[in-house]
Amino acid sequence: MASRWMEWTCCGLWLFGKPTQKKYTQLFEEPSYKCSERVKQEINKGLPPGVSVGDLILGDKSTEALNQAHLLALQSNNITEYLARFNAAEIPASCQGIVSNQIDKLKAMQSVIWNAMISIATSNVELSDSGFQLLLDKQACENMTLMEMEKLATAISVDNTTNWAREISNIIITQPTHALPEAVPEKPEPIYDDPEELESTMLLQPTQQKKTTVTQQQIL
């Protein structure tokens, strides 16, 4: 009783009771969304070289921000794949101008995507529905560039073109002679003994032609 009285007395050592040793620890709520390892890798792969902010996106961002970053990362990865395929192919000189313009457009679009992803990850900036839709519309226009590059890449695959040309040349060289079409003989033109005399006869008057005929008969 004495010890209890000492705890509650105004002259005691513990004015409001003896303190306990327990400390307050903050409880963090678990996020309602779950991110798969594949999504995490795609986001990290879609970021600019030397930048790794995927953990920031997954750590303290909302589900909406995570979905936006994932969609942007997928588009960035597609652009990177197309650029890598074009760097690996030899482009004819006649197509250099067109290809360089397409590559510049894709790189500019990828820079916009990178900036948007970094803003989402490192700051409290979140794209609004209208702004994100505008970015997706711009991206849809750039998909036409991807289709053009796909057609051009298919057309200028150098290895296949070289093999095809070599096969055609071999077929032409090794073609048998009997397969060649036979030459059609030309019809010979009529040969006249004295075309000048015939022409002069045609130009004579009818009376003169009769006299010439009579003289020829007398000679015979």
UniProtKB/Swiss-Prot annotation:
Species in which this protein is naturally found: Alcelaphine herpesvirus 1 (strain C500) (AlHV-1)
Species classification: Viruses, Duplodnaviria, Heunggongvirae, Peploviricota, Herviviricetes
Subunit note: Oligomerizes. Interacts with UL7 homolog; this interaction mediates UL7 homolog incorporation to virions.
Keyword field contains Phosphoprotein: yes
Family (UniProt): Belongs to the herpesviridae UL51 family.
Lipoprotein listed as a keyword: yes
Compartments it resides in: Virion tegument; Host cytoplasm; Host Golgi apparatus
Top-rank taxon: Viruses
Pfam families per UniProt: Herpes_U44
Disulfide bonds: none
Signal peptide start and end residues: none
Protein name: Tegument protein UL51 homolog
One Gene Ontology cellular component: viral tegument
Covalently lipidated residues, kind S-palmitoyl cysteine: C11
